[in-house]
């Protein structure tokens, strides 16, 4: 070996020695660079792309906005986008890739609970950080996840209360209709127990499930119509993904109007109604913690930003830019994460987790959104909106103020003794 080769080898050995002596890890090396990498884990293909693609774009918009203001701790955010393609095991693989190969500081992603459940053991094992922006069934609390969507106490229970009330139509019979996976089944388990606690008999509750991507709702809608002949009926829909389009089309075909059998949906917002003739659906309901139609300065700013971004990036649907609840939850999440990193003066997972407690952000829903000091969930207002002919929602009911999440439902046996904060591992 020549002298130059020896010199290179010695230099490399010294550098490696210093690195090992200092305990340099992949995370620390990633921090030492000029950018902070941010993972975006949303389905851009498959049955969930109808809902998730726009969340990827929301993160990218927020990153552009943060970078334009100087970044985080003087460093630009660098997005790393992957497509888990509505394939639940692939979510876990992509998460591992983001954390071990791409060395991201945080991941924003998932929609379905089955995708989140796939990701959970990976972020826990590798001590990663996931911000999850969609309503879910609860019954989970991880130190490595911040849940910026709603727990059942912030969506499902208030929606049922509203439909049971005299003002909401006084429903006596209930069809619990969902996609066949953990979120609908667990939510409906909670709702069945809740309805029974309110005196509703088993014979007045019907549960139905369809697979992801299901497209033929003729028989199910006919069954709902028949069931509703037994008394004032409401449908609670936890159908997810592109199946919502044929379901709502079939409601229209069958002439099942909201005044006869109102449907309240937990996974249908402005984006999902884009491909549907909404005129037959006028008056049907959705329960969320945000609607595009809310009038307040923070939402005016949010919707204008999104419209400008969609136009500039030539996004699909830019001619009719829409915002929805999971977009708002995503936007709150990345801004709170930024604030927490700056408070912690580090992207270290444990330091950021500690700094997230009690973070606040002026949310497009019109409230100052707060991350609970203990349970990793946002305090959220609840709104029920009626579908309008233009595909927007008219808010007909809301909670007096923000509602605290209860991750462990009091309507599931054994939950009373579970702590309202993640168990340290």
Where are these regions (language model features)?
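Short, low-complexity disordered leader/linker segments with a strong preference
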Residues: 1-37, 68, 418-425
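Signal peptide-proximal N-terminal region
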Residues: 31-33, 57-79, 169, 197-202
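Solvent-exposed, acidic/polar segments of extracytosolic/periplasmic ligand-binding ectodomains
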Residues: 36, 360-425
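Beta-alpha junction/loop-to-helix N-cap segments that form part of ligand/metal-binding clefts
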Residues: 50-57, 69-140, 148, 209-218, ...
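Extracellular/periplasmic Venus flytrap/periplasmic-binding protein
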Residues: 90-93, 137, 144-254, 297, ...
């Amino acid at each position: 070996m020549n002298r130059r080769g020896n010199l290179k080898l010695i230099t490399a050995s010294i550098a490696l020695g210093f690195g090992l002596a200092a305990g340099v890890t992949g995370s620390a090396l990633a921090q030492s660079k000029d950018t902070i990498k941010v993972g975006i884990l949303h389905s851009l293909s498959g049955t969930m792309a109808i809902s998730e693609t726009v969340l990827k774009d929301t993160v990218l918009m927020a990153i552009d906005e943060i970078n334009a203001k100087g970044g985080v701790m003087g460093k630009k955010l660098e997005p790393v986008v992957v497509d888990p393609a509505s394939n639940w095991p692939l979510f876990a693989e992509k998460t591992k890739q983001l954390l071990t190969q791409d060395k991201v500081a945080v991941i924003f992603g998932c929609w379905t609970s089955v995708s989140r459940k796939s990701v959970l053991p990976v972020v826990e094992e590798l001590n990663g950080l996931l911000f999850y922006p969609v309503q879910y069934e609860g019954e989970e609390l991880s130190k490595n996840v911040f849940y910026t969507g709603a727990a059942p106490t912030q969506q499902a229970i208030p929606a049922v209360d509203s439909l049971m009330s005299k003002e909401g139509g006084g429903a006596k019979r209930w069809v619990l209709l969902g996609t066949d996976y953990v979120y609908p089944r667990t939510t409906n388990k909670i709702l069945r127990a809740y309805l029974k606690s309110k005196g509703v008999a088993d014979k007045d509750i019907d549960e139905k499930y369809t697979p992801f991507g299901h497209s033929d709702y003729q028989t199910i809608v006919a069954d709902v119509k028949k069931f509703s002949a037994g008394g004032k009926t409401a449908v609670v829909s936890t159908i997810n993904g592109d199946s919502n389009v044929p379901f709502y089309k079939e409601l229209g075909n069958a002439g099942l109007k909201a005044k006869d059998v109102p449907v309240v949906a937990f996974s249908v917002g402005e984006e999902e109604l884009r491909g549907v003739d909404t005129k037959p659906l006028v008056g049907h309901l959705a329960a969320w913690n945000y609607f595009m139609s809310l009038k307040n300065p923070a939402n005016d700013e949010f919707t204008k930003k999104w419209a400008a971004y969609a136009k500039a990036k030539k996004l699909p649907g830019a001619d009719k830019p829409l915002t929805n609840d999971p977009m708002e939850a995503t936007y709150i999440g990345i801004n709170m994460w930024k604030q927490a990193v700056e408070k912690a003066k580090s992207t270290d997972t444990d330091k950021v987790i500690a700094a997230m407690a009690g973070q606040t952000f002026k949310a497009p829903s019109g409230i100052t959104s707060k991350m609970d000091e203990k349970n990793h969930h946002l305090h959220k207002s609840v709104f029920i909106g009626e579908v309008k002919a233009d595909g927007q929602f008219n808010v007909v009911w809301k909670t007096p103020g923000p509602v605290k999440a209860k991750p462990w439902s009091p309507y599931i046996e054994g939950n009373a003794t579970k702590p309202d904060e993640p168990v340290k591992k």
